[in-house]
Swiss-Prot record:
One annotated GO biological process: translation
Record keyword Signal present: no
Name of the protein described by the UniProt record: Large ribosomal subunit protein bL34
Source species taxonomy: Bacteria, Bacillati, Actinomycetota, Actinomycetes, Micrococcales
GO cellular component: ribonucleoprotein complex; ribosome
Transmembrane segments: none
UniProt keyword annotations, A-Z: Ribonucleoprotein, Ribosomal protein
HAMAP family: Ribosomal_bL34
GO molecular function terms noted in the UniProt entry: structural constituent of ribosome
Membership in a protein family: Belongs to the bacterial ribosomal protein bL34 family.
Protein source organism: Clavibacter michiganensis subsp. michiganensis (strain NCPPB 382)
Length: 45
């Protein structure tokens, strides 16, 4: 039997997909700008 692959961890999630990580790179800032333009209420994890 294989284990469940999703083992939730908020700290790991924030480190990989968080707002501060997005702000760090130019590409990340572009992602946030695109999500703002689309009207997302949640910009990042």
């Amino acid at each position: 039997m294989s284990k469940r692959t999703f083992q939730p961890n908020n700290r790991k999630k924030a480190k990989k997909h968080g707002f501060r990580l997005r702000m760090r790179t130019r590409a990340g800032r572009a992602i946030l700008a695109a999500r703002r333009g689309k009207g997302r209420t949640e910009l990042s994890a």
